[in-house]
Amino acid sequence: MICSAKDARYISAAAYEATKSEVQARLGCIAVVSGKIIARGYNHYRTYSKDGLIGMSCSCHAEIDVLRKCLKQNVTKRIVLYIIRISRGGEFLCSMPCNKCFHCMKDFQIKSLIYTDASGNVIKTRFCNFTSDHKSKGELAIIRQNLLSN
């Protein structure tokens, strides 16, 4: 899929959200429904939520932050997610959702995902065509710790 001028504006908004993150992997995310930004978020240190969306994790991922805000507004349909990861120098890095975020997204009717690949290229895809087995650094650290303690 080709990105439009509107997509570029939303990508910029998600990148701005990423600048707010104090986590090593600085990700920002926005949710758009019918051309309107309905939720903004970024990854931050939080390891629990009553809604169950933050599971075994070292942080609240940007996607989950946004989905929690959508849920609070009872918005669960026709959502387009823009997920951007930036370096300290402002360059785009891989922002592909991890497998845990992907599984949480399945509970929503996500229309499309826009994220960046390992080369910083913008990828736009329909959610129904997306899959992820990517593990976040936090999840890998937890797995390593569990293996060491067993």
Sequence positions of predicted segments:
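General secondary-structure propensity
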Residues: 1-3, 28, 37, 48-52
